[in-house]
A protein has these predicted regions:
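Short, well-ordered loop/turn and helix-capping segments at boundaries between secondary-structure elements
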Residues: 24-25, 150, 180
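C-terminal outer-membrane beta-barrel translocator/porin domains of Gram-negative envelope proteins
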Residues: 1-101, 106-118, 122, 163, ...
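C-terminal beta-signal and adjacent terminal beta-strands/loops
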Residues: 109-124, 141-143, 154-160, 181
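Short basic/hydrophobic patches in alpha-helices and adjacent helix-turn junctions
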Residues: 92-96, 135-140
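Short beta-alpha connecting loops at secondary-structure transitions
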Residues: 118, 130-131, 151, 155-163, ...
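Conserved active-site loop/cleft motifs that coordinate metal ions or position small ligands
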Residues: 103-107, 145-152
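Outer-membrane beta-barrel "beta-signal"
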Residues: 139-144, 167-182
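A short alpha/beta connector and helix-capping loop motif
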Residues: 119-135
Length: 182
């Protein structure tokens, strides 16, 4: 990045790859104006940042799990764990209540962050994986693209489930924007 090489000190290549797939599981007419519909959505994104030689990156240019779009519910990670490789995966079961306006969702997220792209491929283990799941409400209006969710967060450490709070399941409120790829 940077337009002025003499003044700017951080130069890097950033790569983002995204994939989405949708399956209609059920589309049953209930009335003349409404169908009971369930859609399964699978979303994945893989991001890497590669600094140029002799360039040090500040934390503001590194990747992180933000708790709103990646690893929903993990809102405290962005300030303590940043890296140069991020893989975010989501599976959602969506039920449109008012198509194009409002739907009910259930999500399961898996987010992985590593300090370097090389370590992402060579040193990945279960302690690097952050899971979250829960129900949510999605507003699909372009003027009001909000999502309200309840998220439960955990990791699998040494083969055992470790809840984020250290005690057990705890629902956390998450407010996010409903961003669609076009």
């Amino acid at each position: 990045t940077g337009l002025i090489p003499g003044l700017e000190k951080q130069f890097f290549l950033s790569s983002d790859t995204k994939g989405e797939i949708y399956f209609t599981l059920l589309d049953l007419p209930v009335s003349e104006t409404w169908n009971l519909k369930f859609v399964l959505a699978g979303l994945t994104s893989l991001s890497f940042v590669e600094p140029t030689p002799n360039s040090q990156l500040s934390d503001s240019n590194k990747l992180y799990i933000d708790g709103m779009f990646t690893g929903r519910g993990w809102s405290s990670l962005y300030s303590i764990h940043r890296g140069l490789a991020l893989w975010n995966n989501t599976v959602e079961l969506r039920m449109p209540i008012a198509p194009g306006i409002f739907s009910l969702d259930f999500f399961f997220d898996v987010a992985i962050i590593k300090d370097t792209p090389r370590n992402f491929f060579t040193e990945l283990n279960s302690n690097d994986v952050y899971y979250s799941f829960g129900p949510g409400f999605r507003f699909s209006l372009p003027q009001f693209p909000l999502r309200m969710m309840l998220a439960n967060t955990f990791q699998v450490r040494d083969g055992k489930v470790a809840w984020q709070n250290g005690k057990g399941p705890e629902w956390q409120f998450v407010l996010s924007f409903n961003i669609t790829n076009r």
